[in-house]
Each structure stands twice: as C-alpha cells, then as structure tokens.
C-alpha cells in the first residue's frame, strides 16, 4: 500500500518493484492506498472493484522475464506481467467524480448480523 502523493505514483511503484532482483519475477502487482489492509483480501478486492477502471488502471508488460516454474508462461522464463492501480484517483489524474467515502460497519452491527445470520435463510 502507498500514501499517494502525486499522479502516476502507483505505476512508478510497480515498475520499481519489477526492477528489484527477485521481485522482477512477480507476476501480478496490485497497488492500493494506505487505508486498505493488504492482509485482508476482501479489502484488496474492494479497492480493485471500487477504484479501478480496467482501461485506465491496468498495465500489461509482455515478453518479460518470468519464474521458470510459471506454468502459464508461453515460453520458459518469458511471459507477461499485470499491474493494477487500485488507488483512489484524483482530479490531476482526470477523475472528475465525487470521491466516495468507504463505509465502515461498527463492531456491534457486525456482531448482531453474525448472530442472526442463520435466521436469514441465505
């Protein structure tokens, strides 16, 4: 995660990581804002689905070194990488919409819903 300070910083982070030793073999990098818990996959997926536009925020690099053991690569040691910028976009990045704040559910509500979950019939 990053505390974004300027447009394009997420892509700069991706490129920097891919340029560092063994991290060059990383197949997919997802960059999120500092408000996203990178250890909680639900939060990462939330960031991707609410802050990413596929055309604007994905980077694909073709014909680049990959892990020898990557079974998806078309050739041994040569394949593609995917970068996803799942950070909140700014006006400077061409984002003209109102930024939506993340709604956090309080612990009491979570406990209530969890205790009643079986009765919902879902």
Language-model-detected regions and their locations in the chain:
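Charged, compositionally biased interaction regions
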Residues: 1-122
């Amino acid at each position: 995660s990053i505390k974004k300070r300027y447009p394009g910083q997420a892509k700069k982070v991706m490129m920097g990581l891919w340029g560092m030793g063994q991290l060059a073999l990383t197949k997919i990098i997802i960059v999120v804002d500092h408000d996203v818990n990178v250890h909680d996959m639900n939060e990462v997926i939330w960031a991707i689905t609410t802050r990413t536009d596929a055309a604007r925020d994905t980077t694909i690099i073709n014909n680049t070194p990959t892990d020898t053991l990557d079974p998806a690569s078309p050739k041994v040691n040569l394949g593609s990488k995917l970068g996803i910028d799942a950070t909140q976009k700014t006006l400077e990045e061409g984002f003209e919409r109102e930024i939506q704040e993340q709604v956090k559910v309080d612990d009491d509500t979570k406990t209530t819903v969890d205790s009643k979950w079986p009765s919902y019939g879902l």
